[in-house]
């Protein structure tokens, strides 16, 4: 057994200047680091799953759709070629104007009289009401002899309203657009008339 006298009585403790203080880390920084670390691990796992399983499956499906589209296109071309071989053509010049009922005369243009125009505008009703008001005012003026100042002012206001209605009326623009559409349809019909019609 070691005696008590063998231990030194005075211990030389280090000075406080040589002791380095440990700085504690901020808990917010630790939380952010942990969140980023966990997020990186999750993203890496998702990337692995997508690269190993999802991407090959999508590539296979895309290739299958591409092959199917190519197969359908080739079959359609073959069917169209076979139908064109069976189609008998007759020149338009050999046909008269509606000589046979089993032919369609594609070069016949539609007349403007056959076009049914639906007037969904409310301007006609407004113009009709204004004309009725004008007739009533004229009758009142004739019956009273001389129009009063209030009637003249009212007639002036009616003329202003009529002018505003005429300025906002777009029926002519719509009519011009419909005519342009008809002309465009006729031009398209002319493009398809290439000198041959099916028989």
Swiss-Prot record:
Record's GO cellular component, any one?
peroxisomal membrane
Where does it live in the cell? Peroxisome membrane
Main localization, broad class: membrane
The Gene Ontology biological process annotation of the record reads: protein import into peroxisome matrix, docking
Keyword annotations of the record:
Membrane, Peroxisome, Protein transport, Transport
Keyword hit for Protein transport: yes
Disulfide-bond pairs as recorded: none
Q: What else is known?
A: Present with 656 molecules/cell in log phase SD medium.
The function of this protein is: Component of the peroxisomal translocation machinery with PEX13 and PEX14. Interacts indirectly with the PTS1 receptor (PAS10/PEX5) and directly binds to PEX14. Required for import of both PTS1 and PTS2 proteins.
**What's the protein here called?**
Peroxisomal membrane protein PEX17
Biological source species: Saccharomyces cerevisiae (strain ATCC 204508 / S288c)
Gene it is expressed from: PEX17
């Amino acid at each position: 057994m070691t005696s008590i006298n063998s231990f030194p009585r005075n211990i030389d403790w280090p000075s406080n200047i040589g002791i380095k203080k440990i700085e504690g880390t901020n808990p917010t920084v630790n939380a952010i680091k942990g969140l980023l670390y966990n997020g990186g691990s999750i993203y890496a796992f998702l990337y692995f799953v997508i690269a190993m399983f999802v991407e090959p499956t999508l590539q296979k499906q895309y290739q299958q759709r591409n092959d199917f589209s190519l197969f359908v296109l080739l079959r359609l071309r073959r069917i169209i070629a076979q139908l064109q071989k069976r189609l008998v053509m007759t020149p338009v010049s050999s046909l008269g104007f509606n000589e046979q009922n089993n032919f369609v005369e594609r070069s016949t243009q539609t007349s403007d009289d056959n076009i049914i125009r639906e007037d969904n505008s409310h301007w006609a009703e407004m113009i009709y009401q204004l004309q009725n008001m004008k007739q009533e005012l004229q009758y009142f003026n004739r019956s009273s002899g001389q129009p009063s100042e209030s009637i003249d002012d009212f007639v002036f206001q009616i003329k202003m309203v009529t002018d505003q209605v005429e300025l906002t009326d777009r029926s002519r623009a719509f009519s011009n657009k419909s005519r342009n559409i008809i002309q465009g349809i006729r031009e398209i019909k002319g493009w398809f008339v290439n000198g041959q019609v099916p028989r």
